[in-house]
């Protein structure tokens, strides 16, 4: 059975044409992208690395990593986001290889081929996130690094990521997130360890609605990123 939620795919298909509009529903992704790329680059040294971006969407993260000197493959199951990614690539001239394929299928085709694997803001949109993490472990080379990000599952996360972001501040379209699919750091850590990945670091992303700025912080109550590593 495919680890794909077609309703989730449809949500982003409908919005895909606005993916690179920095004032659209994707503004939060554009705003946090430099923070995330810097954090990944500091830990993985992207230049010259072979990188796989799982759930790449319209290519915001994929292009940024390629601009740091990485050889990037971006995969997604949404046709429209991938079409937008390829179109933007023509404008930007940034080389990324985009493919419509699941992480699990990619792991069958290219096991142990990547120095770095990223899977950001995607795990909360699939039926079986642990399956994706197992695929990440298979895809990364021994000693390679896997970076994951998602949203914590607690009352504060519901208040900020759903009520605040979707209804009050209207940073995201209503229905973007399903609170039941949010993932606690303890769950993400357990799935990573079960897959054979060692958790190396965790960092939170916080948003100040007054300044409209994001920053990295030790507060992992809402948005957070995790660095993991496969044994050498």
From Swiss-Prot:
GO BP: methylation
Enzyme's top EC category: transferase
Entry-linked CDD domains: AdoMet_MTases (cd02440)
Sorted UniProt keywords: Methyltransferase, S-adenosyl-L-methionine, Transferase, Ubiquinone biosynthesis
Hydrolase in keyword set: no
E.C. number: 2.1.1.222, 2.1.1.64
Ligand binding (S-adenosyl-L-methionine): 36, 55, 76, 120
Catalytically driven reaction(s): a 3-demethylubiquinol + S-adenosyl-L-methionine = a ubiquinol + S-adenosyl-L-homocysteine + H(+); a 3-(all-trans-polyprenyl)benzene-1,2-diol + S-adenosyl-L-methionine = a 2-methoxy-6-(all-trans-polyprenyl)phenol + S-adenosyl-L-homocysteine + H(+)
One Pfam family matching this protein: Methyltransf_23
GO molecular function, one term: 2-polyprenyl-6-hydroxyphenol methylase activity
Keyword Acetylation: no
Protein's pathway: Cofactor biosynthesis; ubiquinone biosynthesis
SUPFAM superfamilies cross-referenced by the UniProt entry: S-adenosyl-L-methionine-dependent methyltransferases (SSF53335)
PANTHER family linked to this entry: METHYLTRANSFERASE, UBIQUINONE BIOSYNTHESIS O-METHYLTRANSFERASE, MITOCHONDRIAL
Family as reported in the entry's similarity comment: Belongs to the methyltransferase superfamily. UbiG/COQ3 family.
Record NCBIfam families: UbiG (TIGR01983)
Function: O-methyltransferase that catalyzes the 2 O-methylation steps in the ubiquinone biosynthetic pathway.
Name of the protein this chain belongs to: Ubiquinone biosynthesis O-methyltransferase
Species of origin: Pseudomonas aeruginosa (strain LESB58)
Gene from which the chain derives: ubiG
């Amino acid at each position: 059975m495919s680890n794909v939620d077609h309703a989730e795919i449809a949500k982003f298909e409908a919005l895909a044409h606005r993916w690179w509009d920095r004032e659209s529903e994707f503004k939060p992704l554009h705003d946090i992208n430099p923070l995330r790329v810097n954090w990944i680059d500091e830990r993985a040294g992207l230049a010259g690395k072979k990188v796989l971006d799982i759930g790449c969407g319209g290519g915001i993260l994929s292009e940024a990593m390629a601009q740091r000197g990485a050889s990037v493959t971006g995969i997604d199951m949404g046709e429209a986001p991938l079409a937008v990614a390829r179109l933007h690539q023509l404008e930007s001239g940034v080389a990324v290889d985009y493919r419509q394929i699941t992480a699990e299928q990619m792991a069958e085709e290219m096991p142990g081929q990547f120095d770095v694997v990223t899977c950001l803001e995607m795990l909360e949109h699939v039926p079986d996130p642990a399956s994706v993490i197992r695929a990440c472990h298979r895809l990364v080379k021994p000693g390679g690094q896997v970076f994951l990000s998602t949203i914590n599952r607690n009352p504060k996360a519901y208040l900020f990521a759903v009520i605040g972001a979707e209804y009050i501040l209207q940073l995201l379209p209503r229905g973007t997130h399903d609170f039941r699919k949010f993932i606690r750091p303890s769950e993400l850590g357990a799935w990573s360890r079960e897959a054979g990945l060692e958790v190396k670091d965790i960092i939170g992303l916080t948003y100040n609605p007054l300044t409209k700025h994001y920053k990295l912080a030790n507060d992992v109550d809402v948005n957070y990123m995790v660095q993991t590593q496969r044994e050498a």
